Structure formats: C-alpha cells, structure tokens
C-alpha cells in the first residue's frame, strides 16, 4: 500500500471503561455516604453542631460505616504458610483465627491508656438539606382534613421543562454549552464556542396546583426547674426538627410556641429555643393556654390542630386529674395530641401514670431515654398512615 493510501488515523483498542474509574469511584463513595447518613440518622439528628446551627450551614459529622478494604495487622502474630495444595475452590476458608477461641485484640476504646490502634472514621461534610431529605421523606401530619373556608389549592411554580425559546433570564447555561460542544465536535472542532441560536436552551416553568389545608401546631415545653440541661436539650431537639419538617413540607402551617412552669405563656420562637427558666411544674396551665389559643385564634372548623407537649413527667400530683380532663377536652378539638416524656433513667412519672389510662387513638405518647429517641419520636408522631388521604 502506498503512502498516499495510508490512513491518517489510528483505532485504539484501549479499554475505555478504565477512564471512568475515578468518576465511578466518586459515585460509589457518594452512595456510601448517603447510605451511612440513612443508617446513622437516629444519632445524627441530635448532633449538637446541627441542632445549634442556623439551619443553613454545612456541618461535619463522623460517619464510621465507610470502611475500606485493607490489610489488617495480625495482633496475635500467628505464622501462616502461604502455599496451598493446588485443589482449593472458590469459597474455601484460607485461614482461621488462631487465637484458640479467645477474642482477638482490636482497636482500643473506652477510658484509660492503651497500646492498640484506634478506629478510623470518615468526617463527612453534610448539609442540613441532605439530612432533611433523608429524614422527612416518610413523615406527614396525621389525620389531615380539609376545612371550611380554606383555600384548598396552593399554586406554585416549578421549572420542569426545557425549550429552545424563552426569556434570557431563564437560559439554561449548562445545557446550552453542552449542545454547542456536541455540535462543534460533530464538525471536527470540539469546543464550547461558537454558540449558535440552535444551541440555546431555556428553562420553562409550569404552574402547579396542589390540594392543601390550613394547620396549626402548638409546641408546648416544660421549662420548670426539674427539666435539666439534658431534658431541655432533648425537647428542643425534637421541636427543632419538627419546626423544620413542617416548614419544609407544608406551606400553610402556623406554629405557636408555649413555655410553662407553674404558669404558661406564648413566647417568640427564639426565646423558646434559648431561654431557660425554673420553678415548679403545673402542666394543666399549658393546656389551658392551648385551649385559650384555639378558642380565640384557631377555630377547629378552619384549622387542623396538633398540640405537642414535652415534659419530664414530674408534675404536681394534685394537678394530674386536671391534666387528663384538659387533654381529653383538647382532643375533641384536635386531629391528634402528642406527649413526649424525657425520662432517661426510667424513674416513676406521675404524669405518664395518669396518661396511660387515656384510651383514644388520637392520643400518642413516646418516652425518650437516649438521644436517638428524638428520631424515633418524630417517626412515631408523624408516621405515614397506610391508605390515609386528606378527607
């Protein structure tokens, strides 16, 4: 073959899938991070760096489930022979722990000094939004109903379409650049310029109508002297996530914050999450304040009403009968009543002893004994009801 007939190109036989290895590893790593977030949610939702943040920051959290394959040191220093007899099969055991049934040494934990290696963990940067997406996915307000005189249809705009014409303010730069690159590459010059009219892509919106109904949540918290630092932190952690859940998932929901000791008062949100008080405990005062708010501001004919009360259960014994009566009165006007009790050491609770006699499907309670119970309390109070639709 002459020189003039020699091809001016070469065909590569290279395995091009190897060029995606970095991208594939990155995707696999991100999937493992998301899986770790999901598996560690009960502990993550009460991380102080998250609860005390402004809700917008990216926070670093330890995720210990991202173990990579590695050669580990044999702490017992057993000697093994590396040569086989040649007839091994897939799945055969190649070595066993030679410690004679004793537990093998591992990474050191607990108090005191030691000589064992530590346990590695990955400190991932996670945004509040990522946690919310994993946490709120299966939560909803229970028994939500349509109410009279409501604007039951909410309009909002979604950018869910791409067109070749539109407003310059809505141009999709990424899709436009990709379109130009593809067209130029087909002409033998792989570059992002020039950009022609045919390359332009515009994001276009549609008005979406969805049914909705007004709701009010009454966040009631015991701030008496018996509520210590840990008890108040647990209660505020629950209300922190409850508030974010409601504002993320529902557009027409009001939240009233009520703090109480022997007396109850409506307080601003900032004060509810930061101010500490002392004194005795009369829980009936907060239920009276809730009924007062409902009568004056939130008619059951127009609102779905959800009271949530958190306390340590250490109530004045003579007040318990009044509490039960007022809770039953509240439930006649509400869609659901939730009571959360922070009781770390499983001590006797005068209030819970009285509430266990309430037989009503709209009364829900949860006892929180450890930080992870904030997650489980949210799942219990806001669980999805099978087949439940807005009536």
Curated annotation (Swiss-Prot):
InterPro entries: Spore_YhbH (IPR014230), UPF0229 (IPR006698). Residues 1-16 have a biased composition (Polar residues). Coiled coil: none annotated. Transmembrane segments: none annotated. Residues 21-31 have a biased composition (Basic and acidic residues). This is UPF0229 protein BCA_0588. Residues 1-31, 80-117 are annotated as: Disordered. It comes from the Bacteria. It comes from Bacillus cereus (strain 03BB102). Belongs to the UPF0229 family. Residues 98-115 have a biased composition (Gly residues).
């Amino acid at each position: 073959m002459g020189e003039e007939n020699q091809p001016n190109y070469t065909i590569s036989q290279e395995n091009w899938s190897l060029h995606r290895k970095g991208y594939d590893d990155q995707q696999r790593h991100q999937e493992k991070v998301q899986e770790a977030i999901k598996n560690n949610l009960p502990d993550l939702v009460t991380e102080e760096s998250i609860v005390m943040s402004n809700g917008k920051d990216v926070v670093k959290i330890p995720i210990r489930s991202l173990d990579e394959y590695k050669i580990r040191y044999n702490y017992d220093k057993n000697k093994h022979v590396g040569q086989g007899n040649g007839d091994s099969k897939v799945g055969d055991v190649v070595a066993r722990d030679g410690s004679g049934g004793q537990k093998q040494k591992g990474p050191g934990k607990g108090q005191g000094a030691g000589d064992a290696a530590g346990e590695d963990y990955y400190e991932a940067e996670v945004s509040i939004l990522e946690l919310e997406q994993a946490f709120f996915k299966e939560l909803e307000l229970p028994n939500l109903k349509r109410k009279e005189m409501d604007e039951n249809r909410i309009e909002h705009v979604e950018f869910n379409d791409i067109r070749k014409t539109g407003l310059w303010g809505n141009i999709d730069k990424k899709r436009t650049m990709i379109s130009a690159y593809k067209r130029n590459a087909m002409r033998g010059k792989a570059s992002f310029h020039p950009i022609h009219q045919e390359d332009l892509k515009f994001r276009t919106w549609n008005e979406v109508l969805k049914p909705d109904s007004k709701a009010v949540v009454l966040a009631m918290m015991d701030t008496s002297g018996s509520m210590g630092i840990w008890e108040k932190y647990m209660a505020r952690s629950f209300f922190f996530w409850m508030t974010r859940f409601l504002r993320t998932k529902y557009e027409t929901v009001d939240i009233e914050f009520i703090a109480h000791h022997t007396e109850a008062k409506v307080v601003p949100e900032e004060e509810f999450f930061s101010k500490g008080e002392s004194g005795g405990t009369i829980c009936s005062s907060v239920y009276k304040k809730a009924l007062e708010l409902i009568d004056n501001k939130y008619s059951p004919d127009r609102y779905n009403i959800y009271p949530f009360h958190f306390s340590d259960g250490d109530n004045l014994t003579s007040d318990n009968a009044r509490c039960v009566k007022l809770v039953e009165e509240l439930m006649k006007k509400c869609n659901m009543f939730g009571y959360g009790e922070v009781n770390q050491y499983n001590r006797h609770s005068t209030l819970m002893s009285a509430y266990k006699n309430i037989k009503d499907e709209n009364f829900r309670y949860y006892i929180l004994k450890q930080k992870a119970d904030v997650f489980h309390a949210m799942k219990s109070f806001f669980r999805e009801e099978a087949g439940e639709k807005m009536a």
